């Protein structure tokens, strides 16, 4: 699954009254460039995550990742949003990762605190997401 396919999957899955959830996508540079009529490169500020989601009364920033790793995750997978994730967590906010393993063909879920504590994790340390 490509990163874009993974993001679209999460967006479609959690934009659902059945799951008592709604999800909103942050526009990124790729989106803005695709929509630009001139075709010129557009540069936007970095977003704190891919989405913001409310589910069952709890709002959280949501980052979607895909990986080819057989063993688990490493800090490079989370580096881009780490500073913004930490700012959100330090202010008492919620941050969630949905990670798709292309080797295991399944989704995992992790809190921002779990990843911040140690981003180098084995798959057996993660909670499997059944969606």
For each of these PLM feature ranges, what is it?
Residues 47:
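Beta-rich catalytic cores
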Residues 67-88:
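Mg2+/Mn2+-dependent nuclease catalytic core
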Residues 108-131:
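Intrinsically disordered, low-complexity terminal regions enriched in charged/polar residues
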């Amino acid at each position: 699954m490509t990163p874009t396919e993974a993001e679209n999957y999460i967006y479609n899955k959690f934009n659902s009254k059945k799951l008592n959830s709604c999800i909103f996508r942050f526009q990124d540079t790729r989106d803005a460039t695709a929509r630009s009529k001139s075709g010129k490169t557009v540069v936007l500020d970095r977003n704190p995550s891919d989405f913001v989601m409310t589910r069952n009364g709890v709002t959280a920033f949501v980052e979607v990742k895909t990986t080819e790793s057989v063993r688990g995750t490493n800090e490079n997978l989370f580096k881009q949003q780490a500073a913004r994730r930490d700012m959100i967590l330090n202010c008492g906010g919620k941050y969630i990762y949905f990670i798709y393993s292309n080797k295991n063909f399944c989704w995992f879920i992790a809190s921002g605190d779990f990843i911040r504590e140690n981003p180098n994790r084995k798959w057996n340390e993660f909670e499997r997401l059944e969606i």
